[in-house]
Curated annotation (Swiss-Prot):
This is Pyrophosphate--fructose 6-phosphate 1-phosphotransferase. Optimum pH is 6.8. Mg(2+) binds at residue 111. One of its GO terms (cellular component) is cytoplasm. The record marks 112 as: Important for catalytic activity and substrate specificity. The active site is at residue 141. It comes from Xanthomonas campestris pv. campestris (strain B100). Its EC number is 2.7.1.90. The keyword Transmembrane helix does not apply. Non-allosteric. InterPro entries: ATP_PFK, PFKA, Phosphofructokinase_dom, PKF_sf, PPi-PFK. The keyword Metal-binding applies. Optimum temperature is 40 degrees Celsius.
Length: 418
């Protein structure tokens, strides 16, 4: 067995396929005789020295892990600040890594997680500790720079498009005597990728969603209400998909929840769908229903995209390969080779090009009226939701998901008092 262990940690909001990435990491490491330790609840588990020995899990359990949503080892929203501000925490992290002979650190998350992995690699180098840090991409927001798409996004996009298409059939059936406007709120703070993917639900101008509201275009309430009225008068009903992060012309979030922020320092947004529904009811008098799918859109493994599932495993395997090749401060990203047929490959990118960068939708993806997507956007989104990821069902009619044993590794250091 090669000397040293590999530490894997999950960060931020989980997805329908982040465990597929974990399975890719563990499977590839096992094939190369490397033990994988997992941090319980992300980077906090590493700081607390709460580590899990994945070698105690059977091959069958790891195979089932690839079909299970959520985060099997626990995740967290905890951002390490700069090396100057949080130096003691970074040093504690290195102390834990050294105590458990960790030579490879894989951090599975978004922009902030890429930044943390980069800083850990820099500190390890400064301390002369032989550590290879690899970022592993994950986010349903699809806002990571460099990569063509992000593992987790394709499945969330598929859930969104399917949900909007099905809900539209319901609204159309009831519109004559009941609900005329349905508003669906999608995740997406500064980038509207997920809401935009709902555009796949329809083909023609009268198909749902007739209106998509994105952060990339300033929200104009008068224009929005006029469009709703136009669609109801033309087809009898209207479906709206709104990104949670839509902003007005002054850059203020439409659903600003009193200025509160989450643990990453991001604005804590309230319900934009409820706000829009109130405006439609008050100004136009239509009966409105709205929904906030929230965790459902990122945990719906039963609707996972096969493309997304395969890419999630591929970045996990590539991360291990890069680490064992001696690469450092890099992240495996997805490069699109062609649209039709859709082909892709995994390539390494420097972490500093991903850390704390945010990718928004290009203007060419947005219709001139600001209420929908272009054919170019459709060509981008379409292959990402293709195929159905494998999923076993039990005799009870429900998906068979696995719960790992998560056997703890004995601690070697004093308790962390951070």
């Amino acid at each position: 067995m090669t000397n040293g262990n590999l530490l894997y940690a999950q960060s931020g909001g989980v997805t329908a396929v982040i465990n597929a990435t974990a399975a890719g990491v563990i499977g590839e490491a096992r094939a190369r005789k490397i033990k994988v330790l997992a941090a319980r609840n992300g980077i906090l588990g590493a700081l607390r020295e709460e580590l899990i020995d994945t070698s105690k899990e059977s091959a069958a359990a790891i195979a089932a892990l690839a079909q299970t949503p959520g985060g099997a080892f626990g995740s967290c929203r905890y951002k390490l600040k700069s090396l100057e501000q949080d130096r003691a925490k970074y040093e504690r992290l290195l102390e834990v890594l050294r105590a458990h002979d960790v030579r490879w650190f894989l951090y599975n998350g978004g922009n902030d997680s890429a930044d943390t992995a980069l800083k850990v690699s820099q500190l390890a180098k400064a301390f002369g500790y032989p550590l290879h840090c690899i970022g592993v991409p994950k986010t349903i927001d699809n806002d990571l720079a460099v990569t063509d798409t992000c593992p987790g996004f394709g499945s969330a996009a598929k859930y969104t498009a399917v949900s909007v298409r099905e809900a539209a059939l319901d609204v159309a059936a009831m519109a004559d005597t009941s609900t005329k406007v349905f508003i669906y709120e999608a995740m997406g703070r500064h980038a509207g990728w997920l809401a935009a993917a709902a555009g796949l639900a329809g083909q023609g101008p009268d198909d749902a969603p007739q209106i998509i509201l994105l952060p990339e275009r300033a929200f104009d309430q008068a224009a929005f209400l006029a469009k709703v009225r136009q669609m109801v008068e033309r087809v009898g009903w209207c479906v709206v998909v709104a990104s949670e992060g839509i902003q007005d012309a002054q850059g203020k979030f439409v659903a600003d929840a009193g200025g509160a922020t989450d643990s990453f320092g991001h604005a804590q947004l309230g319900g934009v769908a409820s706000f829009l529904a109130a405006q439609v009811k008050q100004e136009l008098g239509y009966k409105v229903h709205w929904t906030l799918p929230d965790y459902l859109q990122r945990s719906a493994r039963h609707l996972a995209s096969k493309t997304d599932w395969e890419q999630a495993q591929a970045v996990g395997k590539a991360a291990v390969q890069y680490a064992l090749k001696g690469m450092n401060a890099v992240i495996p990203v997805i490069e699109r080779v062609s649209d039709a047929p859709y082909r892709w490959k995994i390539v390494p990118a420097p972490l500093h090009k991903v850390a704390n960068h945010e990718k928004k939708m290009p203007p060419s993806f947005l219709r001139k009226d600001g209420f929908g997507i272009t054919e170019r956007a459709r060509r981008y989104f379409a292959p990402l939701i293709k195929g159905e990821a494998p999923l076993a069902y039990g005799s009870d009619g429900l998906p068979k998901y696995v719960s790992l044993k998560n056997v703890a590794v004995a601690k070697k250091l004093p308790a962390w008092e951070g």
